[in-house]
């Protein structure tokens, strides 16, 4: 099951947040969350508002744990995720390879509901 929240300002979609519930019966208590906000709309509370709505929806669906992934260096994202109650639980070293050959780690965060 997938659910998307869109933020529209003056006819332009400026942000989106999605919730993807795990399909396997043993994992249906978990869901993955993804979020994006266009840079010129940062610091307006859009990400926080979408996350709050998504958490409300997840609880209504009986989801017990939310998960997300982020790439090292995403400091703005990390601040939002921590503000929303997520905590880092794992690192995937060298998970991302950039065009110049540089590797970045990917991190997993969870939040219990």
Positions of PLM-derived features:
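Conserved GNAT acetyl-CoA-binding A-motif
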Residues: 51, 58-69
